[in-house]
Structures are given as C-alpha cells and as structure tokens.
C-alpha cells in the first residue's frame, strides 16, 4: 500500500478505499440499516426495540407472546472484481474495529489482504485471506447480532425466530 500522496510504481495503478455508512433508505423507515457486526450497535438496537416490547407486553412473554420474529437479519453482501481492469465500486461488509478483531483472531493484518478480497485470484486459486475474512465477518455477525438478541430473548423467556 502507498500513501495517498505517493504515486504508484510504473505499471501499477492507484485504487482508493473509503469507509462509508450506507445512505438512509425508505425500506428502513428512511434510516440506515443497523451495523450487525457491531455489538454496541446491536445492544442499542435491543434497547430501542426489544425493551419497548418488554414495556408494552413483557408480562405476556413466554405465554401469549411466545417469540420474537426477526426478518432476515443481514450484513452487506461482498462484491468482487472478476477482471484486473474491471472498474466498478466494490462493497465489503465492515465495522470500525474489524482490523483489530481480525488481527486478534488471525495474528495478521487486514488491510494488506484487501486485493485478495476484491479481485479473483488467477485460475480460481483458493485464498486464505478471503476464507479468513468471510469466517471473521460471519463470526462477528453471529456474536454481535445473534448472540446479543438470543441472550436477551432467553433472559425474557422468549424464543427467537
């Protein structure tokens, strides 16, 4: 990687990486989708939503209200560039501390692996960096979203669907 002010070596090109928060969208009541990889964001989501349910109908949890339905929780899909000269935006699921938690999980830096996440390797070769990225993002989602909401539901005598 080079600094923004540096020029690439001959035969190489400069690509830019931006961390962006998705724009507000009418599908989500003119808000952005919650960061399902971020435990603090999900705890706040539970405070705003599930705690409101508990105030209104909490006495019926486990009886008249046996479960909470969660409709297709997700994180952003990952896109790739299939050809070295392809020019389009690429989206990668990301959260603020991903480089730190990736380093803690694998003893490796995240940012230098970005080319393997963005471009297909020649001949369809297998990528350890890509495997680790998907494994880590899936684990982040499971621990931040599923565990947080699942534990809240269990503590409130609710099933989670």
Predicted regions and their residues:
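Active-site acidic/histidine clusters and adjacent loop/turn architecture
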Residues: 146
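Mature extracytoplasmic enzyme cores
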Residues: 1-131, 138-139, 143
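Beta-sheet entry/capping signal
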Residues: 14, 63-68, 150-152, 157-161
């Amino acid at each position: 990687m080079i600094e923004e002010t540096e020029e690439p070596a001959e035969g190489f090109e400069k690509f830019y990486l931006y961390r962006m928060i998705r724009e507000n969208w009418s599908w989500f009541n003119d808000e952005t989708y919650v960061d399902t990889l971020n435990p603090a964001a999900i705890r706040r989501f539970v405070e705003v939503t599930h705690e409101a349910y508990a105030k209104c109908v909490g006495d019926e949890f486990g009886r008249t209200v046996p479960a909470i339905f969660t409709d297709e929780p997700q994180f952003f899909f990952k896109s790739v560039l299939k050809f070295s000269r392809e020019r389009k935006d690429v989206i990668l699921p990301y959260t603020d501390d991903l480089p730190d938690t990736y380093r803690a999980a694998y003893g490796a830096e995240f940012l230098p692996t970005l080319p393997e996440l963005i471009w297909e390797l020649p001949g369809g070769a297998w990528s350890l960096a890509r495997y680790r990225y998907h494994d880590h993002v899936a684990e982040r989602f499971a621990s931040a979203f599923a565990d947080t909401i699942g534990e809240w539901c269990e503590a409130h005598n609710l099933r989670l669907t």
